[in-house]
Amino acid sequence: WLTGYDTFGYVFFQTLVLDQKGNIILLTRAPDLRQAQNTSNINDIRIWVDKDGSKPADDLKLILDELNLKGKKLGIEYEAYGLTGKNALSLNKSLENYCSIEDKSELISKLRVIKSEEEIAYVRKAAVLADKALDEVWKYAKTGVSESKILAEMNRVIFEGGGDYPANEFIIGSGKNALLCRYQAEKQILNKTDQLSIEWAGTFKHYHSAMFRTIPIGAADSKH
């Protein structure tokens, strides 16, 4: 969000260091080097070598030394998705007696709440794509149609409209799976009398507009 860096490499150890002097340094793995160069405004990109016995937290400490941050107060985004418990323990151990640490997990999240005009435009574009996906649901939500076909058509119109993958899978269920609240791999064929529950998002440049619909197939019963 701060730099434009577009990757799912956050599932591995990587750190963006920002200091009060305006220095911005990314520590990441080699597979994300060109990703950062092509998608972000980060100029200083450092690589830690991913091999048996690697300790990227120690590589981070070298960067902190370079920035004269020893003995200073550092905020860490502990709630970051890629910072696993193991990596957090390694990070804490590396920085023990080196600097003081504060949990600043909400610092960026709170800033992101206030959207720019450009971001709002992205969300609105995502909403248009979500509506187009819903149009496909209405076309194919019929007896004898596979949930797979519905998902395929929804994703087709989103990608053809310039959209992206969503942050998580579309949630779809009918029959015995109609009340599930999470995606699972089994796909059903819609029955003569059924209920289709579907939750999805139109996504544009990773900005989402999410929707949910419950659609009776055939005649609605008293529960509906």
Regions found by a protein language model. Name each.
Residues W1-H224:
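Active-site neighborhoods and metal-handling regions in enzymes and metal-associated proteins
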